[in-house]
A protein has these predicted regions:
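RNase H-like nuclease fold core
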Residues: 2-11, 17-106, 110, 114, ...
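Alpha-helical interaction segments
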Residues: 16, 76-77, 158, 165
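Extended amphipathic alpha-helical interaction segments
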Residues: 117-185
């Protein structure tokens, strides 16, 4: 019984089958040849499996197509996040028609840039700002982070490339003694 409506097991089964067929079609659809920007991330969600709740890695790929429209290219589920799974995902995207990706924004998973490069060798990879900021918070004492984050923000909120480069140089110069921080940025 759902919302005071009784449904037979057969009806629920048929509805589930219909939805699953649409999901499979969507997940295997042909994609555009080029996505100038692609954002990737993996998050963990609780899912029901064998009558118990467990955490699974949910891989999400969001592309910005040549018309500037955002498009979810796919969603995959696995037990954990790994560079090898990301490699499989990029190979699947290639088989679905994606020939070129200019930039990928990603987290700092070890081996991820190499996994992307193995499928799309010309693609530029960059850690996303959110993950860089989280890493700054995780490696520095709280009393230092406010000023550092404020200085770092000047880089990625610059109005143009020239100003961003200048702010980056200022940041590196100011914090060059903090090797741990510089390595993360």
């Amino acid at each position: 019984e759902i919302y005071s409506i009784e449904l037979s097991e057969e009806t629920i089964s048929n509805m589930t089958k219909s939805v699953n067929e649409e999901i499979v079609k969507w997940q295997n659809r042909k994609l555009q040849k080029c996505y100038p920007f692609v954002y990737i991330d993996c998050l963990y969600c609780s899912v029901k499996e064998d009558l118990r709740s467990i955490k699974k890695a949910i891989y999400v790929v969001l592309g910005v197509n040549t018309e500037g429209k955002k498009e979810v290219l796919g969603i995959w589920i696995d037990s954990t996040e790994s560079a090898s799974k990301w490699c499989e995902i990029f190979e699947e995207l290639k088989s679905r028609g994606v020939e070129d990706i200019f930039f990928v924004s990603m987290d700092g998973l070890t081996g991820l840039p190499e996994a992307i490069e193995s499928v799309y060798p010309q693609t530029i990879t960059q850690r996303c700002i959110v993950h860089i900021v989280r890493n700054i918070y995780s490696i520095l004492p709280k009393k230092e982070t406010k000023e550092i984050i404020s200085d770092f923000k000047k880089i990625y909120t610059s109005s143009n490339l020239e100003n961003a480069k200048l702010e980056y140089e200022n940041f590196i110069e100011k914090y060059r003694e903090n090797k741990k921080l510089i390595k993360k940025v």
